[in-house]
Design a protein with these regions (language model features):
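Active-site-facing alpha/beta catalytic cores
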Residues: 74-75, 79-326, 369, 377, ...
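Non-transmembrane, aqueous-exposed alpha-helical and coiled segments at domain scale
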Residues: 303-306, 310-312, 318-349, 356-405, ...
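Short glycine/proline-rich, acidic loop/turn segments that cap or connect secondary-structure elements
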Residues: 401-419
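Glycine-rich, charged/polar anion/phosphate-binding loops
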Residues: 52-54, 276-279, 306, 335-337
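N-terminal basic/disordered segments at the start of proteins
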Residues: 1-66
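A general structural signal for short secondary-structure junctions and capping/turn motifs
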Residues: 57-60, 98-100, 282-283, 384-387
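Short loop/turn segments at strand-loop or loop-helix junctions that form parts
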Residues: 68-73, 110-113, 352-355, 398-400
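Conserved phosphate/anionic-ligand binding catalytic regions in large, soluble enzymes, centered on
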Residues: 294-295, 354-358
């Protein structure tokens, strides 16, 4: 009998496996029609961009690059607005400039954008005042309003999700091609928080050094820096709603491979990483680089099987393991995970998600995360990898370019009482603009590479 990873694969073979976290559509014909329409639409990304990202991730595995992956916990259709997209892109690019300066290596920029419209839920239903309805699973599945009509999964939302994703990625490409007027000039960045930090001197030194380096580049190259340093930017989302992913899976004859062209880098979450499950089955057959969230519930045998199933040929850049243990558990859990993967003989890219393992409830009942715990998990991850002869190749964060108050701490010392001032997330708390940039400054300072000898 063939094991799951040795059975024949095609874009629909996931339908023969147990599929967690999938919507229960009432009308199978309407679903089939929506999937058929979606499969005829142009791809959102192209195969050569996917291949280029895989090559860059392979370089990150070798320690030659660093992955910055970030964006909203869950995108909403209403947030498909030029200003909000530009702010998210801008903070990611600003963070990448700071990290490039501090780490002295190129940064791979990957957004949780242009497709992050679905969210896994801990329960299939929600009950309010004695009324039970399907859980809200993200805008690509149903609506947040607590009514039977809004909560019914609607296949047409798959098409609306495609449209929003295409609009988002096209606008991002236009912004990158045109350059931001102030992106490469730190004197125009919003750095008001720096004066509130005990690391004020270090932050100011880093920002001044970035500005000096960019000014020097423009002087010797006779080009504006944003035209010479055009930033590649990639999209990623959790491959959760598999009918959507299936419909955008295309065979590229010149490569003789199947690609998911709804995004550059799909990932599998903890709730859908079952070895015999539909999500692992789907992701094992595509040429895209794939991420997998790794938490405390995943034992060594499970992790090892995932590695060999998702990347049987040990292709460099194919598999990124995103560990999310939390500051309190990382010291006991991460060494076991590193040793388990090493025993397979396979190479992976290790990156840290310091957000999900550090979620807690505030005194007012809002979900929040403490900046100090986020930073502590990153610090511990870096040290543990170094101690075990491995290396941390990136960071995965939930953030926004807006002035929200969802995570406590940071230079301004946001407290529980501050959260209600601008708490906008409908799912998980995000770092705001200032906290995101501060995190990049701290990573750059604590992992500063020595200056190369001339």
């Amino acid at each position: 009998m063939k094991t799951p990873e040795h059975q024949a694969w095609n874009p629909t073979s996931w339908q023969t496996r147990p599929a967690q976290q999938q919507p229960s559509y009432r009308d199978a014909t309407a679903l089939a029609d929506a999937v058929a329409k979606l499969s005829r639409l142009p791809p959102i990304v192209v195969s050569w961009e996917v291949d280029r990202l895989r090559e860059e991730l392979a370089a990150a595995q070798r320690g030659e690059r660093f992955l910055l992956q970030g964006g909203d916990c869950a995108e909403s259709f209403d947030d498909c607005e030029s200003d909000k997209i530009a702010k998210r892109l801008k903070i990611l690019l600003q963070m990448s400039l700071v990290l490039t300066h501090g780490l002295k290596k190129p940064i791979i920029r990957v957004g949780r954008m242009a497709g992050q419209y679905a969210k896994p839920r801990s329960a299939d239903t929600e009950t309010r005042d004695g009324v039970t309805l399907p859980s809200y699973r993200g805008d690509i599945v149903n609506h947040a309003e607590f009514t039977p009509e809004a909560r019914a999964p609607d296949p047409q939302l798959l098409l609306r999700g495609y449209e929003r994703a295409a609009l988002t990625i096209n606008f991002i490409r236009a912004l990158i091609d045109g350059g931001f007027a102030d992106l490469h000039h730190p004197e125009y960045w919003d750095l008001g928080f720096v004066g509130h930090s005990p690391f004020k001197v270090e932050y100011e030194r880093i920002v001044a050094s970035v500005a000096d380096g960019l000014e020097f580049f423009e002087t010797i190259s006779s080009k504006e820096v944003h035209t010479a340093l055009r930033a590649d930017f990639y999209a990623s989302h959790e491959a959760l709603v598999l009918h959507y992913e299936q419909a955008q899976t295309r065979f590229i004859a010149r490569n003789n491979r199947w690609y998911n062209l709804s995004t550059h880098m799909p990932w599998i979450g903890m709730r859908t990483a079952q070895l015999d499950g539909a999500h692992v089955e789907y992701c094992r057959g595509i040429a895209n680089p794939v991420g997998v969230k790794v938490g405390t519930a995943m034992d060594a045998a499970w992790l090892q099987r995932l590695v060999t199933t998702l990347n049987p040929q040990n292709t460099p850049g194919k598999l990124t393991l995103i560990h999310r243990f939390g500051a309190k558990d990382i010291e006991s859990a991460l060494p076991k995970a590193i040793q388990a993967v090493r025993a397979t003989g396979h190479s992976v890219l290790w990156i840290c998600d310091p957000m999900h393992g550090n979620t807690e409830s505030s005194q007012s009942g809002l979900k929040t995360r403490r900046f100090e715990n986020i930073l502590r998990e990153l610090d511990l991850a870096t040290r543990i990898h170094q101690d075990l002869g491995s290396h941390l190749g990136g960071v995965h964060v939930e953030l926004t370019g807006e002035d929200v108050t969802e995570c406590t701490g940071g230079a301004r010392g946001l407290a529980d009482l501050d959260l209600q001032r601008a708490y906008k997330s409908s799912v998980d708390p995000r770092l705001n603009y200032e906290q995101s940039l501060e995190l990049a400054l701290l990573i750059a300072e604590r992992n500063r590479a020595p200056r190369r000898s001339r």
